[in-house]
Amino acid sequence: KAAIEELERAVTGLGLKGAELDTIVNGENWDAARFLPFFKAAEAMGAVLFYHPQPQHNFLTERTTRYGLFNSLGVILEDAIVVAILILGGVLEACPNLKVCIAHGGGPACYAMGRLDRGWQGNAEARRSIPRAPSSYQKQLYYDTVVGSEAALRFMIDQVGIDRVVLGSDWP
């Protein structure tokens, strides 16, 4: 309830377009049932939810402490996981008009969509919350351009379309 009130204050009171969220909240994934009212409220407000991982919450923290891997790989893996959670957890099915943008071009999510589809086909748990293959939801999301290379950007555009890509920057 407090998160809904704060989002409403930000959007209606302050004139902001939405909110930036971490890819995990207090150790819980975003497909937890208790977050659905928040998503429904954001959808009703037309608010944009921008997901950007925080390195300290990286699920691979112990394995990415060297070589700057927490930033170069850890955060993009978090991006891909939040894409999968929002899709497979049924959030995008329950809120088809929800405006969600994923940092770093969604990490490797676009590249891995075929694997998510195959996993969905062969796993009853994966099919529980969504009636269609995961790839059919990927164009409901927006992705920023902080992908690291022109080739990655071109691949992402080919997968989701230019109308789902927004300018991004890791610099203020």
Model region roles, listed by residue range:
Residues 1:
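Active-site mouth loops of central-metabolism enzymes
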